[in-house]
C-alpha cells in the first residue's frame, strides 16, 4: 500500500508491508520504502486525511533508522552441577570454621616450671608417670615405658583425710589435733548431721530378707538357724562338762528394724596412717522389738559319781532395747586381714598340714567370733579361724588381702535385756533375780569383748567387679533363661508346690547350682553355715556333685530322695566359706 505523507516539508512514499484490515482500524506493523501500491495483491488507495485519526502515534521510519533487534539473554558461566558443588563446599567450610572457633578451644599452655616449684609438697601433683624422676629429663612419646610403670602411681595425698574432705566438700577438719594420754581423740565435725532415711530402708530390706530366708529354711536339718544355733551352743570344746545338752525351744528374729540417724564424718588420729583416718558416726536405736531366744538344759552333778544329780533349767533372753553410737571406718587392704588390723605374725616352723588341720578344726566351731583389736598381734599358740582361712585363700588367689570394713560401738551404749528363768523339776523357782543378773552380766561382757571400743569387728568387703558369673535377670525371665542355659549365674528360686528347696543352674565359671526337693531335706550342701566355693572349676550342674564345688540335685519325683551325700565328697573343699547362721544363701530369691 503506497501513500504520500508530508513530513517536514518533504514528500515520502511509504509502503505498508503488512496490513490487517478490521472493520474500524488498521494495524501497522512496520514501514519500509517501496514503490508498490498493492496490499495482499489488491490495489489500495490511502487517504492522507485519515492518517492522524488512525495513527496518532505513528512516526515515520527512514531507511537509515531501522528497529534494533531485542538484546540476547546472558548465559550463565557455571552449570547447575558446578553451582551445587560450590554451594555444598561453602556450607562445609562454614560448619568447620564454626566448630573450630566456637566449639573447640585452644590447647592450654604447658605449665611453667616456676609455678610447679612454688607449690608445696602437700599440694604438688604428678602430671606424668615418672614425674618425680623426669623433672629435668622429660620422656618422649616414642620411648616405651617399662611394664611396671604402665599403671600410674597413686599420689600420696590421695589417701590423706584432708584431701578427701576437700574434694568431697565436707567440713570435718579437727579443731584440736592433739592427743591425750596417747589415745586418739574424737573431733566433732562442723558439717551438719545427715539423716539416714535411705540407709534405714536398705538395712530394713536386708534384715527382712534374712528373716524370710531363715523361715524358708526352717525345716532343713542342716541349713536352718535352729540347727546352727544348736551346734554352736553344744560345742564340746566350749561347753562345760556340768551342763547337759542345750536344747533351743524358741527363736524370734523380731519384727521391727533398727533406725539410724544423726550421721557425721569425723577425722580420727591414727599413727599408722598418713593424715589420720576418717570415721563415720551414726546413732542407732532398736526398741519395742521381739528378739528372743529360749533354751532348756540341765545342770549335772558329777560328784562323787557322774550324773549324781540333775537340775533342769529353762532360760529365755529377750532384747528390750538397744541404743548406741556406731563407728564405721575402712581399713586398707595390704596391711590388714579379717582377724586383726595390724600385722599378725605366725610361727615360721608351722607346717602347711598342721595349719590346714587347725583350719578345718576351727571351721567346725562356726559361731565363735574372735576378738578384733587395733594393731594386736596374734599369739603364736593361737589357731587360725575360718575367717583367717578365707583371708588366706583370698590373699593367695588375688595377691593381696582385700579392703575391710571395721565397725564398733562407743562405750556409751545401752542394752536392756529381759531374762526369764525356771529352775527345778517338781518345785520350780521362777524368775530368780540372781540368775537374771548372771545372765545379763554375761551377755554384756560377751558384747563388750567383741564390738565395743577399742575392740572392733573387721569384715572383708565383697568384690563388686562386674562378672558374668554373677549376672542375673530381673522378672519372670529368670527361670526360662536358667532352663535354656542363657545366663551364667545360678538363678535360684524357691520351690513351687510347697517346696522350701532351692533350684538353680550353674554356668560359665560358676560352681553349679542347688536344687532341693519339696521338703528341703536331703540337700547336698550345708546351708547357711558352710557353702561350697562359688567359683568352682567346671561345676556346671550336670549331675550330682560332679566338678569341683558343683552340686546338682534334681527336684523331680524320681530324684527326690537324692541327697547331698553323693555330691558332698567332690563338692566340699578345704577353702569353704563360713556363713553367719540365719543368713541368706547365695542368690536366693524370695517371692
Swiss-Prot record:
Pfam families attached to this UniProt entry: MMM1
Chain ranges on the Lumenal side, renumbered to this chain: 1-83
InterPro entries membership: Mmm1 (IPR027537), MMM1_dom (IPR019411), SMP_LBD (IPR031468)
Top-level taxon of the source organism: Eukaryota
Positions with biased composition (Basic residues): 180-189
Biased composition (Polar residues): 146-159, 170-179, 336-371
Function: Component of the ERMES/MDM complex, which serves as a molecular tether to connect the endoplasmic reticulum (ER) and mitochondria. Components of this complex are involved in the control of mitochondrial shape and protein biogenesis, and function in nonvesicular lipid trafficking between the ER and mitochondria. The MDM12-MMM1 subcomplex functions in the major beta-barrel assembly pathway that is responsible for biogenesis of all outer membrane beta-barrel proteins, and acts in a late step after the SAM complex.
Protein name (Swiss-Prot/TrEMBL): Maintenance of mitochondrial morphology protein 1
Organism whose genome encodes this protein: Ajellomyces capsulatus (strain G186AR / H82 / ATCC MYA-2454 / RMSCC 2432) (Darling's disease fungus)
Biological classification of the source: Eukaryota, Fungi, Dikarya, Ascomycota, Pezizomycotina
Amino acid at each position: 500500500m503506497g501513500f504520500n505523507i508530508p513530513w517536514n516539508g518533504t514528500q515520502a512514499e511509504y509502503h505498508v508491508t503488512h496490513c490487517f484490515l478490521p472493520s474500524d482500524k488498521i494495524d501497522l506493523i512496520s514501514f519500509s520504502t517501496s514503490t508498490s501500491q498493492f496490499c495482499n495483491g489488491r490495489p489500495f488507495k490511502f487517504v492522507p486525511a485519515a492518517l492522524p485519526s488512525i495513527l496518532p502515534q505513528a512516526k515515520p521510519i527512514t531507511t537509515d533508522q531501522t528497529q534494533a533487534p531485542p538484546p540476547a539473554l546472558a548465559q550463565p558461566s557455571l552449570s547447575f552441577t558446578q553451582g551445587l558443588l560450590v554451594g555444598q563446599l561453602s556450607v562445609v567450610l562454614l560448619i568447620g570454621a564454626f566448630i573450630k572457633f566456637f566449639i573447640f578451644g585452644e590447647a592450654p599452655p604447658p605449665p611453667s616450671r616456676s609455678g610447679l616449684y612454688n607449690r608445696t609438697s602437700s599440694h604438688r601433683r604428678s602430671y606424668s608417670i615418672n614425674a618425680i624422676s623426669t623433672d629435668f629429663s622429660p620422656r618422649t612419646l616414642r620411648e616405651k615405658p617399662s611394664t611396671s610403670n604402665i599403671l600410674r602411681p597413686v599420689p600420696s595425698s590421695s589417701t590423706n583425710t584432708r584431701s578427701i574432705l576437700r574434694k568431697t566438700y565436707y567440713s570435718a577438719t579437727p579443731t584440736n589435733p592433739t592427743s591425750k594420754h596417747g589415745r586418739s581423740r574424737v573431733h566433732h565435725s562442723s558439717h551438719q548431721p545427715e539423716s539416714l532415711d535411705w540407709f534405714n530402708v536398705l538395712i530394713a530390706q536386708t534384715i527382712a530378707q534374712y528373716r524370710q530366708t531363715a523361715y524358708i529354711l526352717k525345716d532343713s536339718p542342716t541349713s536352718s538357724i535352729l540347727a546352727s544355733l544348736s551346734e554352736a551352743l553344744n560345742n564340746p570344746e566350749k561347753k562345760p562338762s556340768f551342763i547337759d545338752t542345750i536344747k533351743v525351744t524358741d527363736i524370734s528374729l523380731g519384727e521391727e528394724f533398727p533406725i539410724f540417724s544423726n550421721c557425721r564424718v569425723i577425722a580420727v588420729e591414727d599413727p599408722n596412717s598418713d593424715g589420720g583416718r576418717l570415721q563415720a558416726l551414726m546413732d542407732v536405736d532398736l526398741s519395742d522389738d521381739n528378739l528372743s531366744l529360749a533354751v532348756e538344759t540341765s545342770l549335772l552333778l558329777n560328784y562323787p559319781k557322774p550324773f549324781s544329780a540333775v537340775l533342769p533349767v529353762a532360760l529365755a533372753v529377750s532384747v528390750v532395747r538397744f541404743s548406741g553410737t556406731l563407728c564405721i571406718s575402712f581399713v586398707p587392704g595390704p596391711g590388714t586381714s579379717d582377724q586383726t588390723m595390724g600385722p599378725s605374725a605366725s610361727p615360721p616352723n608351722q607346717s602347711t598340714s598342721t595349719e590346714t588341720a587347725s583350719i578345718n578344726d576351727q571351721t567346725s566351731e562356726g559361731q565363735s567370733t574372735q576378738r578384733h583389736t587395733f594393731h594386736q598381734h596374734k599369739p603364736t599358740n593361737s589357731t587360725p579361724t575360718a575367717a583367717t582361712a578365707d583371708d588366706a585363700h583370698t590373699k593367695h588367689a588375688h595377691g593381696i588381702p582385700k579392703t575391710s570394713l571395721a565397725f564398733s560401738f562407743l562405750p556409751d551404749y545401752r542394752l536392756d535385756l529381759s531374762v526369764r528363768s525356771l529352775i527345778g523339776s517338781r518345785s520350780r523357782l521362777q524368775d530368780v533375780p540372781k540368775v537374771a543378773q548372771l545372765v545379763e552380766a554375761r551377755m554384756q561382757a560377751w558384747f563388750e569383748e567383741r564390738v565395743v571400743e577399742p575392740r572392733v569387728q573387721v569384715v572383708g568387703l565383697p568384690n563388686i567387679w562386674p562378672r558374668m558369673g554373677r549376672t542375673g535377670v530381673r522378672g519372670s525371665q529368670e527361670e526360662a533363661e536358667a532352663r535354656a542355659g542363657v545366663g551364667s549365674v545360678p538363678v535360684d528360686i524357691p520351690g513351687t508346690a510347697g517346696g522350701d528347696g532351692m533350684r538353680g543352674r550353674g554356668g560359665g565359671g560358676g560352681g553349679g547350682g542347688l536344687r532341693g526337693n519339696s521338703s528341703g531335706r536331703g540337700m547336698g550342701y550345708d546351708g547357711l553355715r558352710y557353702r561350697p566355693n562359688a567359683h568352682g572349676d567346671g561345676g556346671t550342674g550336670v549331675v550330682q556333685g560332679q566338678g569341683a564345688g558343683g552340686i546338682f540335685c534334681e527336684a523331680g519325683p524320681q530324684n527326690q530322695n537324692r541327697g547331698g551325700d553323693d555330691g558332698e565328697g567332690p563338692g566340699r573343699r578345704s577353702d569353704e566359706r563360713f556363713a553367719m547362721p540365719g543368713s541368706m544363701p547365695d542368690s536366693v530369691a524370695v517371692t
